[in-house]
């Protein structure tokens, strides 16, 4: 099997992006794991697949696979790269692009060729829709994680997130708590774990341990989840700058029931082709 691809990143969260409209490529979990290997493959956090639309209201269907081969519902940084890719490859000339995903629909707005605003949809706090095992929706939950007791927020941005407020992002125990939270029994589909330091009401520092990928340089849906939880808990205002290890995102949310918007860069690194 031989196919063309692009390597892209959103704030260091890196992707292999493949057009499966003009190419016929099948990605098995084993093949994805081989391609994701940074020593013997292409190397990436996620594989993004562009498919023909599943319904007449969408321009494309957007699929996301983690480096471990698992398919996931959402990737905000990937969505920005997806928008740049389909324009760069001549698959569309639209500036507003409608895509379907495993979990729903998204709208991608191209502000400039490398600056994209994504309508991430309405944050979902109902436990059974995250999914998260809890009797009722709360702003803050208490989780036992190993020897630790954590006060967390839980939300779905199309994929499940748990967010913990920390005093200093530099000393947060992301390496140890991240994998424990990811596989916590109260999250039946596993979860992305965010560690948020509130700098001010319009600024946070954030690290994210991603489900199936580990800690990444940036996580767009994680940034959205952190801001949504912070606003719900009364810690943040509606316009927030998020500092991640790989760079900055701007998040805007007017509160429960309203869609959340994320603005950030999408960077093309190179084009390649591979036989496997």
Swiss-Prot record:
Offer one example of a GO biological process linked to this entry.
lysine biosynthetic process via diaminopimelate
Q: Report a single Gene Ontology molecular function.
A: diaminopimelate epimerase activity
Q: Where is this site: Could be important to modulate the pK values of the two catalytic cysteine residues?
A: 161, 210
**Main location per UniProt?**
cytoplasm
Listed under subunit, the entry gives: Homodimer.
Q: Which family does it belong to?
A: Belongs to the diaminopimelate epimerase family.
Protein name per its UniProtKB record:
Diaminopimelate epimerase
- Naturally occurring in which organism (per UniProt): Vibrio cholerae serotype O1 (strain ATCC 39315 / El Tor Inaba N16961)
């Amino acid at each position: 099997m031989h196919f063309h691809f692009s390597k892209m990143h959103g704030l260091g969260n890196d992707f292999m992006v493949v057009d499966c409209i003009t190419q016929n490529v099948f990605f098995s979990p084993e093949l994805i794991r081989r391609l994701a290997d940074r020593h013997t493959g292409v190397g990436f956090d996620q594989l993004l697949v562009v498919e023909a639309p599943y319904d007449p209201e969408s321009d494309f269907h957007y699929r996301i696979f983690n480096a471990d081969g698992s398919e996931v519902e959402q990737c905000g940084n990937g969505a920005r790269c997806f928008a740049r890719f389909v324009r760069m490859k001549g698959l569309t000339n639209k500036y507003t692009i409608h895509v379907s995903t495993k979990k729903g629909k998204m709208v991608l707005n191209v502000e400039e060729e490398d600056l994209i605003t994504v309508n991430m949809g309405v944050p979902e706090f109902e436990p059974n829709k995250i999914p998260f095992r809890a009797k009722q929706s709360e702003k803050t939950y208490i989780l036992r994680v190993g020897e630790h007791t954590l006060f967390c927020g839980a939300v779905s941005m199309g994929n499940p997130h748990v967010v913990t407020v920390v005093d200093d992002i530099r000393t947060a125990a992301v390496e140890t708590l991240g994998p424990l939270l990811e596989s916590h029994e109260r999250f039946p589909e596993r979860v992305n774990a965010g560690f948020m330091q509130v700098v001010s009401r319009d600024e946070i520092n954030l690290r994210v341990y991603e489900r199936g990928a580990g800690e990444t340089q940036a996580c767009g849906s994680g940034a959205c989840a952190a801001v949504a939880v912070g606003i719900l808990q009364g810690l943040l205002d509606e316009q927030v700058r998020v500092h991640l290890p790989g760079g900055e995102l701007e998040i805007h949310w007017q509160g429960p029931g309203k869609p959340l918007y994320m603005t950030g860069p999408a960077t093309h690194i190179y084009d390649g082709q591979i036989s496997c």
